[in-house]
């Protein structure tokens, strides 16, 4: 053997000496040891300085350590918020289950989407969204220091409680420690009040507070020993650090401008309630005057038959008008609240509609121009126009609240700087696309407008679909779904996607969770275009469940196009017929490997052959062989028609 230099000490290794050859290098036997533990090596890893390290020492020195258990990670690594975890250690701080879908990061803890979407504990003190104070005409009463508000006649069991941070349990209808909500004799025996919070509570006797009646005047913080504190920016809400809980969505109210707006809103509400009562009284007087005129008027001269008919008609009016006066006012009030007309808003860019612009430009070019020039094409809503309700969904970018806008139930999607994936540019993109997409299309939710007054707190308002997502429906095995209904849902989704692709919009996040189902089983596609410009690694980190719907070419670094939406639709088709989660019981981080290998969910044995063929065509490995949504719509129509013919023959 030729003479060589030692790979460690660089001195000559004599042919007759004890030596070790590894790869193309030769070592003295005494040099072929681990630099750290000094043990003889069976295998090694060369460090940056050229020294040799055994596998065990390499793991100790260089392997990533789990943020939770602090042990080296030698298998699948889960990365979130710059922290690394073992797959089994990445679990929810609330339910302690392994997080397989999206998560919510609050105060150093990770929570699964299920726990984050649950209603918060009623005993916790939280700051409500700014519009949670009811608008005029809503049941309930808004409270402020030193302000007396007559409870409206339609008041229900919703009350508001004002208490201190120091004694959240000191509420009683008969005095005691804390502040009293009753109108007689509430005594404050505690320390001076420095900050207050307004809570919405359901009158279930949890606080032993009596529900105000229609004739009750609520006077807050009446005290025999202290004067009523005045509202200021520091007393409208507690500091965020003391009020924040993992399951609550918090909005900072410490801004002086907003504090003044809220104080003005409370006073405005009192005035509007008084105006509403005056209008009702005036309407009552008008109806009574009309009745008096009918009583005093005599029938006009006419033939006997006509006079008889006229008299009968007037008699009927006299007999029925008086008992219905209150009912008419009630119906008028309900109509104004629940059936408010919302005028359709048609966005225009430089005076032209989308249809006109698409004749000469692509949708991407139009969208790029709007975003680059910061052209606002959506209807701008004020906070005062919207009332917030309960949380109905949550994710990395924010939460979705149930709310009321112009008397209609709506969904309010809120983005806040407190959220993990807060991005103003993405918000602008989403509301711009939602404004441009035809809201009259039966398979999209109607978009009403957005608010960007506070750059750290953004929201947009759209139609509320109360029945929930397609995913929820499919996983609820107690709700039977006929094959014809399944075909109808699939056709609705395909029609929505066909429209998007026809104007050049790629969804990029089509999945059962982004499809809402109405009470008559109409499917409405939501969240289109929101994931554009998000790289693959970030998208998988933010929303792990999305990997089930991602086509194999995406994991190879190829870009998004229409065929990626078709692949995702194939997975949704499978979900509709199988009524299961795709890749069930498989770790989300392992799914890309399975997809790249060509593995797909198992199609049920009882799946109709035509439907099965369509699924396979949509999720084929070769993008060019996947059908367009126009072809998919035609195929589903033929399947439905053949099913109808078979029914008629029977």
UniProtKB/Swiss-Prot annotation:
Domain LIM zinc-binding positions: 4-63, 64-122
GO BP annotation list: signal transduction
Species name: Dictyostelium discoideum (Social amoeba)
Recorded GO MF terms: ATP binding; metal ion binding; protein kinase activity; protein serine kinase activity; protein serine/threonine kinase activity
Residues engaged in binding ATP: 392-400, 413
Active-site positions on this chain: 509
Family statement drawn from the similarity comment of this UniProt entry: Belongs to the protein kinase superfamily. TKL Ser/Thr protein kinase family.
Protein name: Probable LIM domain-containing serine/threonine-protein kinase DDB_G0287001
UniProt enzyme class: transferase
Compositional bias annotation for Gly residues: 173-188
Classification via InterPro entries: Kinase-like_dom_sf, Prot_kinase_dom, Ser-Thr/Tyr_kinase_cat_dom, Ser/Thr_kinase_AS, Ser/Thr_Kinases-Pseudokinases, Znf_LIM
Residues covered by region (Disordered): 118-138, 171-197, 293-320
Superkingdom to which the source organism belongs: Eukaryota
Residue stretches making up the Protein kinase domain: 386-643
Pfam families: LIM, PK_Tyr_Ser-Thr
EC numbers for this chain: 2.7.11.1
Signal peptide range in chain numbering: none
Gene3D superfamilies according to UniProt: Cysteine Rich Protein, Transferase(Phosphotransferase) domain 1
GO annotation, cellular component aspect: cytoplasm
Reactions mediated catalytically: L-seryl-[protein] + ATP = O-phospho-L-seryl-[protein] + ADP + H(+); L-threonyl-[protein] + ATP = O-phospho-L-threonyl-[protein] + ADP + H(+)
PROSITE patterns listed in its UniProt record: LIM_DOMAIN_1 (PS00478), LIM_DOMAIN_2 (PS50023), PROTEIN_KINASE_DOM (PS50011), PROTEIN_KINASE_ST (PS00108)
UniProt KW keywords: ATP-binding, Kinase, LIM domain, Metal-binding, Nucleotide-binding, Repeat, Serine/threonine-protein kinase, Transferase, Zinc
